[in-house]
Amino acid sequence: MGRTVVELFYDVISPYSWLAFEVLCRYRHIWNIDLRFRPAFLGGIMQQTGNKPPAMLPKRGEYILKDMKRMAKYYQVPVHTSADDFQRILGTSSLTAMRFITATDMTNPQYLEPLSREFWMRFWSQHEDISQPENILAAAQQAGLSAELSQKALEMISTPTVKDRLKETTAEALKYGAFGMPAVVAHYDGKPHLFFGSDRLELLGSIIGEKWLGPVPSPKL
């Protein structure tokens, strides 16, 4: 039986996307899956579906800050929360970063994983502004891209090709029924199965016939 294609639609402004990203990376050599990263734009999904940021409901915002801290510890992902996180999110557009990630995916896909991880590290661990070109270039070079490749990707973000690719990927997520991120789509038994949230990966395993071994599984020997 062939590997099950599992697509992860994500935006680096979403901390729960980071949790799903890291856990799926851990499982890709344990489960019989073909993991595909699909950088998309959360702002576009929120706008198209009429979804609202969690902080719009104060009590929910308070809960999420506590939940994120617990989840980060449980998933062993270095998300560092602070009281001003929602203000940082509302004051930061991830569009430039996601276009840069998309441009890199189109030209040098081998850097997609480390680059995405580096953006999460900078926004959620180091609390940097990932919308600024100098921080974007620094993230790219930390992820292994040369100065030349980084500059080329930065120049590409304003091109119709990159803009259209990001729009298309976001539209695909919406087509599958996404209303937020992370959106995980498993192509199993002849149809797509959508899972929303980093806490649905155990259910994903159940649907595709794989065993859940916790968020930090021991790799196969």
Indicate residue ranges for each PLM-predicted region.
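C-terminal cap of thioredoxin/glutaredoxin-like
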Residues: T4, I13-Y16, A20-I33, P114, ...
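Beta1/beta-strand and adjacent pyrophosphate-binding region of the FAD-binding site
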Residues: E7
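Structural alpha/beta surface segment adjacent to cysteine/selenocysteine redox centers
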Residues: V12, W18-Q126, P215
